[in-house]
């Protein structure tokens, strides 16, 4: 059990037998009336996001989630195989569980896998990851039909928008949460 004062992003709650992760929360103290906590919760299995409000100080049921450091090894059909960094056990995870993170997975990449009662729930990539651009069109300085960006294909096959000065072969820092360009990596 946890109080609303213990809320933090990533905390997993058990509500009506389902697991929900806190995406956002905000303590609100209105001028009139009692304080409350406004939350945005994401269903761990389905990915559905809902808004829920709790009175301040209310106790809620939390779920024990074990986050383990793993390394992504390879793809086997529709499964992604991860190796636990402590006991070297391999965990094949289905494509549905990996979700959108699959477009940023590179062999040998460190990844956290969350487990509940021994069953894998979801994976967490590092926030910033580095990739090599395998293909992008040359950017012309006078070409301003777009907002100064162009599409680029990364070594994983994912496509992101990058500034015009990026060339094929450049190494980039990318935000794994939204696929946003963060900068070039200096060699």
Swiss-Prot record:
SMART domains: EFP, Elong-fact-P_C. GO terms for molecular function: translation elongation factor activity. It comes from the Bacteria. It is found in: Cytoplasm. SUPFAM superfamilies: Nucleic acid-binding proteins, Translation proteins SH3-like domain. GO terms for biological process: peptide biosynthetic process. Keywords: Cytoplasm, Elongation factor, Protein biosynthesis. Pfam families: EFP, EFP_N, Elong-fact-P_C. GO terms for cellular component: cytoplasm. Involved in peptide bond synthesis. Stimulates efficient translation and peptide-bond synthesis on native or reconstituted 70S ribosomes in vitro. Probably functions indirectly by altering the affinity of the ribosome for aminoacyl-tRNA, thus increasing their reactivity as acceptors for peptidyl transferase. Belongs to the elongation factor P family. This is Elongation factor P. It comes from Mycobacterium ulcerans (strain Agy99). The lineage of its organism: Bacteria, Bacillati, Actinomycetota, Actinomycetes, Mycobacteriales. The gene is efp.
């Amino acid at each position: 059990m946890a109080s609303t004062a213990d809320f933090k992003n990533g905390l997993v709650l058990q509500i009506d037998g389902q697991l929900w992760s806190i995406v956002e929360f905000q303590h609100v103290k209105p001028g009139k009336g009692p304080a409350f906590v406004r939350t945005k919760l994401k269903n761990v299995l389905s990915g559905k996001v809902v808004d829920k409000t709790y009175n301040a100080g209310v106790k809620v049921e939390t779920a024990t989630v074990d986050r383990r450091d793993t390394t992504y090894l390879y793809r086997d059909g529709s499964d992604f195989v991860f190796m636990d960094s402590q006991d070297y056990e391999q965990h094949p995870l289905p494509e549905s569980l990996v979700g959108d993170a699959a477009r940023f997975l590179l062999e040998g990449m460190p990844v956290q896998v969350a487990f509940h009662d021994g069953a894998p729930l979801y994976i967490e990539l590092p926030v910033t990851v580095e990739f090599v651009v395998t293909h992008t069109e040359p950017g012309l300085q006078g070409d301003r039909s777009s907002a100064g960006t162009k599409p680029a294909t990364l070594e994983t096959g994912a496509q992101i928008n990058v500034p015009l000065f990026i060339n094929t072969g450049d190494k980039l820092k990318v935000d794994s949460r939204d696929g946003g360009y963060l900068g070039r990596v200096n060699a």
